[in-house]
Design a protein with these regions (language model features):
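Short helices/loops that flank or line small-molecule/ion binding pockets
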Residues: 2-11, 96-100, 114-124, 128, ...
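Adenylate-forming
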Residues: 3, 24-28
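Hinge/capping helix and adjacent helix->loop/strand transition within the periplasmic-binding protein
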Residues: 8-14, 28-115, 164, 174-192
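Paired acidic/hydrophobic, glycine-rich loop segments that form the ligand-binding mouth/hinge
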Residues: 13-19, 80, 126-130, 145-148
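Beta->alpha turn/N-cap motifs
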Residues: 18-23, 112-113, 130-135, 150-152, ...
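Cytochrome P450 core scaffold surrounding the K-helix E-X-X-R motif
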Residues: 27, 156-158
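Conserved helix-loop-beta element of the AMP-binding
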Residues: 42, 68, 143-156, 173
């Protein structure tokens, strides 16, 4: 609703939109999305971005992403995994990993990162794909253990954590981002 209202706002520089990656994904999920992310907005800045993380409980049998993938290949449909919700960038990243790795695993979409993380902590799912910021505290405290991330190359804040590309899964590179946008048509002098 808010993104649609921003898209319809007068292009006078008084309305700005701060949105997550969802603003790009939503039109592919909702047939009647009230905006087009390319046509209706002028990008101003990326405010931040970080990769998604594939994480397990510390006592998980999977020491690496390769261990998890090998088990999943040998045991189709035996593993279940969580994302914050269907259609989120973590969900899409997890699906790309599943498809590119050729594994059959069951996705469980939750109603936000909080419930998905709680399910992981409670052992209700085998692994979680979530935005790094959603699991940062659990990773640092040892409540969850990261197997891989969806960024490109090694990350400065997690230099020992491999990317999924390092396991031969290419095309799954994705970040969850936060962007600042204006309605299309705002004059350039107003934007600068």
């Amino acid at each position: 609703i808010g993104i649609g209202a921003a898209a319809r706002a007068a292009p006078d520089g008084y309305t700005l939109l701060c949105s997550s990656s969802a603003f790009v994904v939503n039109p592919s999920l909702y047939r009647n999305a009230p905006y087009d992310p390319v046509r209706d907005f002028a990008p101003l800045s990326t405010l931040g971005a970080s990769p998604n993380v594939l994480a397990v409980r510390p006592e998980s049998r999977f020491a690496t992403l390769q261990d998890l993938l090998d088990f999943a290949r040998a045991n189709p449909d035996r593993l279940n995994w969580a994302s914050p919700a269907t259609g989120t960038t973590p969900h899409l990243a997890g699906e790309i990993i599943r498809i590119r790795a050729g594994v059959k695993v069951q996705h469980i979409g939750y109603t936000g990162a909080g419930p998905a993380v709680q399910a992981a902590l409670a052992g209700q799912i085998d692994y979680l794909v979530a935005h790094q910021g959603s699991v940062e505290q659990q990773l640092r405290s040892g409540q969850l253990r990261a197997l891989a991330h969806t960024g490109t190359g090694r990350q400065a804040d997690w230099p020992d954590l491999p990317s999924v590309a390092e396991y031969g899964i290419h095309g799954a590179e994705s970040d969850t981002f936060l962007a600042l946008l204006a309605p299309a048509g705002v004059p350039a002098p107003v934007l600068t």
